[in-house]
C-alpha cells in the first residue's frame, strides 16, 4: 500500500520552485546544484530519486534533474580493514557526545559509561566519508548553494511552497538578510524538542538537537567551514550538532523532505549498546534488555560478509562484551 501511495503522487501536476535554477536573472541567490549520494550497488535508488526530482521544475521551467549530479557513496562493504583515525574521521566518540545532543533525563549513567570510547560502525564511517566527499565538491564549485540528498528521500506535499516561503524570508529582508551555512530541510527533532529561536515565520535557528542529514542546503562557505572542523568524531549527524555553535545553522519550520519506508537500511547504529546499558534504546522507547547474560562466553564463526558485525551488535545489546570481525583473538582475551 505504501508503494502504491508513493506512485500515485506522481500522477499529480508537476510543481515549480522559485528557489532552484541558475541565479543570474534572479533578485537573490538560488540553489544551482543538487547532489544525490548513491551507492554503486543500488542503482534502483538512483532511478527512484531521479523520478522524484522530475516532479519538480526550477524557476525557469526546467526539471530539477537537469541540476542534479550523482555522487558515488563510499561503500562499507569494500573496507578491507577497520578504518583508523585520519584527517577526515576519528572513529571513536562517547556517550557524553550523544547525550549532549539528545539528553535522557530518566537515565543516570556513571562517569565510566559517559567517557568510554564507542567505535563507529563501518556503515557510519562510510556515510560520514560520503558526506565529506560532497562537502569538498561544494567547496570547490562556483555555486553559492547546493542541495545535498541521500538516495531514499521523497518530497513531501507542499515542499515547493514551504521551501520558497523560507527562501524568500531568508533573502528578502534587506539589511537583515538571514545568513546560513546549512539549512536543514529534512530532519527529526530529539524527543524533547530542539532548543531553537525562530528567525522568521518559516525559519528557525537550532542550538542543537536535529537528527539526520538526508536533505540539507549547504552554502559554499559552509562547506569550507565543515572541512576546516574535521575530523568528524562519531556519526556525522551527531558530530555536526557539536559544530552548531561555530556555524550559521537554520532549518525550515518543519521537515519538508521525508525518507522512504519501503527500502532496507544498511546502517548499523553503534550507539545502541550504550543506550541499552543506561536503560534507553532510542528516542522512542525504554530498553527491554536489563538482564545480564547467563551464558558466556559466546563464539560465532562465519565467512566474511555473513552478518557477523550485526550479530555482535545484537549481542552487545544483550549485555555481552564483544570482539567482532577478527581473524584471531587479541592477546588480552587469551
Please annotate each region the language model reported.
Residues 288-334:
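PAPS-dependent sulfotransferase catalytic core
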Residues 2-149, 153-291:
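An acidic/histidine-cluster motif and surrounding catalytic segment
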Amino acid at each position: 500500500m505504501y508503494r502504491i501511495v508513493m506512485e500515485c503522487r506522481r500522477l499529480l501536476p508537476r510543481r515549480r520552485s522559485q528557489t532552484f535554477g541558475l541565479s543570474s536573472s534572479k533578485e537573490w541567490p538560488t540553489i544551482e546544484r543538487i547532489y544525490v549520494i548513491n551507492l554503486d550497488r543500488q542503482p534502483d535508488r538512483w532511478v527512484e530519486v531521479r523520478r522524484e526530482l522530475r516532479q519538480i521544475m526550477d524557476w525557469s521551467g526546467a526539471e530539477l534533474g537537469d541540476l542534479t549530479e550523482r555522487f558515488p557513496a563510499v561503500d562499507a562493504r569494500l573496507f578491507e580493514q577497520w578504518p583508523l583515525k585520519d584527517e577526515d574521521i576519528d572513529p571513536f566518540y562517547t556517550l557524553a557526545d550523544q547525550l549532549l545532543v539528545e539528553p535522557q533525563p530518566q537515565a543516570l549513567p556513571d562517569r565510566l559509561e559517559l567517557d568510554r570510547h564507542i567505535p563507529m560502525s563501518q556503515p557510519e564511517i562510510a556515510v560520514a566519508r560520503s558526506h565529506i566527499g560532497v562537502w569538498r565538491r561544494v567547496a570547490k564549485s562556483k555555486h553559492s548553494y547546493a542541495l545535498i540528498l541521500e538516495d531514499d528521500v521523497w518530497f513531501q506535499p507542499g515542499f515547493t511552497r514551504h521551501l520558497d516561503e523560507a527562501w524568500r524570508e531568508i533573502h528578502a529582508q534587506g539589511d537583515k538578510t538571514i545568513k546560513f551555512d546549512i539549512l536543514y530541510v529534512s530532519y527529526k527533532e530529539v524527543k524533547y524538542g530542539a532548543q531553537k529561536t525562530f528567525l522568521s515565520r518559516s525559519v528557525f535557528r537550532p542550538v542543537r538537537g536535529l537528527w539526520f542529514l538526508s536533505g540539507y542546503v549547504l552554502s559554499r562557505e559552509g562547506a569550507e567551514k565543515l572541512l576546516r572542523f574535521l575530523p568528524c568524531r562519531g556519526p556525522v549527524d551527531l558530530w555536526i550538532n557539536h559544530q552548531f555553535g561555530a556555524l550559521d545553522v537554520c532549518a525550515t519550520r518543519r521537515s519538508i523532505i521525508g525518507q522512504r519506508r519501503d527500502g532496507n537500511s544498511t546502517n548499523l547504529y553503534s550507539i545502541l549498546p550504550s543506550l541499552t546499558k543506561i536503560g534507553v534504546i532510542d528516542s522512542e522507547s525504554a530498553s527491554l534488555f536489563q538482564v545480564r547474560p547467563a551464558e558466556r562466553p559466546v563464539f560465532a564463526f562465519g565467512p566474511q560478509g555473513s552478518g557477523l558485525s550485526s550479530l555482535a551488535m545484537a549481542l552487545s545489546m544483550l549485555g555481552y562484551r564483544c570482539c567482532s570481525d577478527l581473524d584471531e583473538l587479541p592477546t588480552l582475551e587469551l
